[in-house]
Amino acid sequence: MSVFAGAAAMLPNPKPFFELIPDPRRATPNKLHSLSDILSIALCAVLSGMDDWEAVAEFGRTKEGWLRQFLPLANGIPSHDTFGRVFSLIDPEAFEAAFFDWAAHARIGGDVLDQLALDGKTVRRSHRGSAGRALHLLHAWSCETRLLVAQRRVDTKSNEITAIPDILSLFDLRGVTISIDAIGCQKAVARQITEAGGDYVLALKGNQSALHDDVRLFMETQADRHPQGQAEAVEKDHGRIETRRIWVNDEIDWLTQKPDWPGLKTLVMVESRRELNGQVSCERRCFITSHTADP
């Protein structure tokens, strides 16, 4: 299968995947561009940071020579109006299926993927009908390619627990680090990741209250002894100053819950201190990971 250069990897040509999407347009002499060409150009443009149809069309014109390496482009680059009209007509579920099929073939895993971040989001203003339930999505992001490589709809945030194993099963996890927020801090999830050859970084919160309390007390004692942390990063932007400090410790044989967590090697605490307009806020978050502590 031919490939094109993606954000940080060699990705498969999206055209064959998009050719499976039904074309909603009538067959007329005015239909100058194939649906798969339009969708493929738009995909490349969005991956390159374009965020409106005029920018997508401009990207196509600027990169036409490169695009012709894997797209016919029989009639050149569509106008921004054509992009907007086509995307307003296509079946969103068919597009979603084709996109995720393409992403699943994008060699996401192994040498290409270093980190996969799973994150649940409730879509704003998505309450449906009289039940008033919002649409909740579980996303899997490739941190290297900046791609949303998988997505699952879940009825409630609590159902992320059942969707996480399903998403993880889509990928080759060998050598990959999986980071998940607190709802994914489950022994079965840790086992699935390590048995597949991956590593995990799992956030701790109230769903593992005893473990969270033990880890937080231990790591805060370490922070009191070494207040500067083992690493520090400072970001300044428009009057906001954010300082992040991190503490890690792999001397955890004292932790009674350690045998229950497959592959657990290291405890982590991250402190985020934000200063804005004279106001200071500070948050500390704890994690468990199967990675060893850096020397």
Swiss-Prot record:
Query: What InterPro entries does the entry give?
Result: ISAs1_transpos, Transposase_11, Transposase_11-like, YbfD_N
Recorded GO terms, molecular function?
DNA binding; transposase activity
Superkingdom of the source? Bacteria
GO process annotations (BP): DNA transposition
The name under which this protein is listed is: Uncharacterized protein in dhlA 3'region
Taxonomic lineage per UniProt? Bacteria, Pseudomonadati, Pseudomonadota, Alphaproteobacteria, Hyphomicrobiales
